[in-house]
Amino acid sequence: RLRYIDGHPSILETLYFPRKYDFLLHENLEGSVFSILHAHGITVHNSRRTLEISNASSNEAGLLEIKRNSPLLLFRDYQSDSQGNPLFVCKQLYNTQNMIFYL
């Protein structure tokens, strides 16, 4: 998914799900993925997030409307259920030119 902030492409998000969640192919994914999973009785129990600095590839730069090799914040989220089974992995690339993060 390509997410916009104030009309500017700002976050490139890629979600990876196990095959058993193929029902998502028939869902409207413009809203919250967590809401869709919850509607199917699936809840996230454990979550782990990593943060790295990355440089935009040609494809990523084109989608985010920035120069190739521009710095990006790369977040990876690992979500699992109460038994530790993987639900999904999320990769988010943030265009830092449009954002300020408050911690």
Question: Which positions does each model-derived feature cover?
Answer:
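C-terminal all-alpha effector/ligand-binding and dimerization domain
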Residues: 1-103
